[in-house]
Amino acid sequence: PSHYYTINIQIMTPCIQIKRVYEAADPADGFRILVDRLWPRGIRKDALPYDLWPKDLTPSPALRRWFHEDPDGRWAEFSQRYRSELATAPSVNEVISRIRPYDTVTLLSAAKATDHNHALILRDFLTQRMG
């Protein structure tokens, strides 16, 4: 007799967390991505463990300067503009293919603000693109 099997394949997406670059690295961080365009102040290049630094996934210099003039007042529009930049960033698909095998991915940023920073938008963008 022939038997038919149904195989359910679920593609898992990594848990993407955000951490300040000044916090200690931890093996639980998984794949670590630096998401600031500029190297963080006060950190030696050999003192920050990271796996990837895709500068084109960071806000453009002009957008970053504009946002920093009024972070609270410009957050909503910054979010829209940054998402538009991400939609055309050349390395998006490469980054997604690099992080997909990991259970955990950590976005590293020097940003002090935890409620209004680009890493939040990038996390949501990557999660949606992988979903």
Stretches with model-predicted labels:
Residues 1-11:
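N-terminal amphipathic/basic-hydrophobic helices that include classical n-h-c signal peptides
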